Amino acid sequence: MALSKDFKSYTEQVELLRTRGLYIGDPDEAEHLLASLNYYRLSGYWYPMRRFQPNGGIALDVFKAGASFELVVELYEFDERLRHCVFGGLDRVEMAVRAMIGYELGRIDPLAHLDVAYLGPRAHARSCSGPNVHEVWLGKYRAALRASREEFVTHYKKKHGSKMPIWVAVEIMDWGMLSHLYGMAPNIVRNRIAHRCGLSAPQLESWLKSLNIMRNYAAHHARMFNRVYDIKPKLNEDPRLVQVAGVMNRVFGQLSLIQYMHHQLGLSTAQRLPEVLNTFPDNDIVPLARTGAPNHWSSLVLCS
């Protein structure tokens, strides 16, 4: 199969960008950054600087006037700060969800996660004659338990056996396992946890899915600021969220979910994300509006 692109050295990559109209003040530094960050990773940041066909909307291999490699790097560095901040912010949310699930399911039974009889209707659902939802989840949980090298897991197994109470077991569950366990939980548990978050159970479940996708982007170094997010979470009637309902498919809307959870659950002062947004490089080619942030963004849920 023929390759669609020819190999180009870093020097040739710089020259290609220059011939297409991207200003590069320091070619040597540009080569160094291309070598350490990769041409196609950076291309996501200069893509909005390209000219587009008037009617078809197809991107041309020509840059807009004023486009520069330096701005590309500034946008990348902003996005890098944003990824790190998002990952840290979601870490707090994940820990809170773990604790709430462990506590509320533990109130039902210490081993509720192991016995479908203690769970809700969704746990019993099955497709055709295959395993039910809980059995599939339980297989993943047991695999995680076997693979864990955590000292507390080894200690607990030696002293008590492999059946860990839910408030211990949640510590080896990743976000996906926690989300599915929340979905399988009995309504009383789902509602208690959702109430603490100021949401209904279906709303919180949709938030957990959205935030898990965002966490995966952050963990895998994916571009965040200039992306369309496919899953739109269900919102409550909180006025702070109503004002951002129209941008839930952009990063600003997704960031608002993190901020809301931090405020609602008292996880932090919620200042880090607004501080990072304030570092967005000021320019006319790729404005902050690309994130979905309105002009009055600082008065919305991100800072309230």
What spans do the regions from the language model cover?
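Long, contiguous internal "core" modules enriched in hydrophobic/ aromatic residues
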Residues: M1-S304
